[in-house]
């Protein structure tokens, strides 16, 4: 059974943090070749701190997907200008929002655990909406790649592109807003239930 849960940075066990940061290195450095900082075969940065909360998706106690949330009132990758060279002036609005970053689904583990038929992206996206709603946020902002945008669109989550930029690889990247309303939540639930019916 796939389980999804959130953990604050301060409560993250050592073994789980090592697993997370190792998987992030595999995804963002080894597979995607992003400009990220790596040390001891792990990827982490200054935003992995007490203001961060992580969503984990696990199967048989193995992490298969994850992302990091940071309230936009605290330093985060978008507001701090990490992506300024890729965009022409981006700024998050004032309000009670949360930024999502370092989102990944581990393809190798999905294959090894024979989960390729499971609606993992929809489950992860639903957990994002549920977390944001439970915490009283107005919505979620993130910067994503073009392939990730396609995954969002296929899931049924009606995200909106706030601004388009160009990465160091000359690929389109997007500042997106993710609404957390009932309609989007229900579409994701329907997609998950549709898969469950097929599997059943």
UniProtKB/Swiss-Prot annotation:
GO terms for molecular function: N-acyl homoserine lactone synthase activity. Required for the synthesis of BHL (N-butanoyl-L-homoserine lactone). GO terms for biological process: quorum sensing; signal transduction. Its EC number is 2.3.1.184. It is an enzyme of class 2 (transferase). It comes from the Bacteria. Pfam families: Autoind_synth. Gene3D superfamilies: 3.40.630.30. This is Acyl-homoserine-lactone synthase. Belongs to the autoinducer synthase family. Keywords: Autoinducer synthesis, Quorum sensing, S-adenosyl-L-methionine, Transferase. InterPro entries: Acyl_CoA_acyltransferase, Autoind_synth_CS, Autoind_synthase. The keyword S-adenosyl-L-methionine applies. It catalyses: a fatty acyl-[ACP] + S-adenosyl-L-methionine = an N-acyl-L-homoserine lactone + S-methyl-5'-thioadenosine + holo-[ACP] + H(+).
